Amino acid sequence: MSGLRVYSTSVTGSREIKSQQSEVTRILDGKRIQYQLVDISQDNALRDEMRTLAGNPKATPPQIVNGDHYCGDYELFVEAVEQNTLQEFLKLA
């Protein structure tokens, strides 16, 4: 797969995960950065793919990947936004 992908889930009881997913997509949309939203709740293989790319068997959404390169999770994303290094974080620069 190529391009920027945000792994998310449409089925979660966690308000924190919902809020984090929403913030990531809101920021990307606001900066007009194109990405594909990958819903891991539709297929266990997608969840496994996300965890393999993240290098963490317990990783939870949102996770951000560009091509086959893992960018990071929500905390790293927010840190990049705050430090104005989002392009580098997303491996777009």
Swiss-Prot record:
Localization in the cell: Cytoplasm, Cytosol; Cell projection, Ruffle membrane; Nucleus
Keyword Nucleus: yes
PTM characteristics: May be glycosylated.
GO CC annotation, single: cytosol
UniProt keyword annotation of Nucleotidyltransferase present: no
Cystine pairs: none
Carbohydrate attachment residues: T9
Tissue expression remark: Expressed in heart, liver, lung, kidney, spleen, thymus, ovarian follicles, skeletal muscle, brain, lymph node and mammary epithelial and stromal cells (at protein level).
Gene3D superfamilies: Glutaredoxin (3.40.30.10)
Keyword entries, A-Z: Acetylation, Cell membrane, Cell projection, Cytoplasm, Glycoprotein, Membrane, Nucleus
Major localisation: cytoplasm
Ranges that cross the membrane: none
InterPro entries for this protein: Glut_rich_SH3-bd, SH3BGR, Thioredoxin-like_sf
GO biological process: cytoskeleton organization
Stated family: Belongs to the SH3BGR family.
Function in brief: Could act as a modulator of glutaredoxin biological activity. May play a role in cytoskeleton organization.
Matching PANTHER family: SH3 DOMAIN-BINDING GLUTAMIC ACID-RICH-LIKE PROTEIN, SH3 DOMAIN-BINDING GLUTAMIC ACID-RICH-LIKE PROTEIN 3
Entry protein name: SH3 domain-binding glutamic acid-rich-like protein 3
Species for this entry: Rattus norvegicus
Source organism phylogeny: Eukaryota, Metazoa, Chordata, Craniata, Vertebrata
Gene: Sh3bgrl3
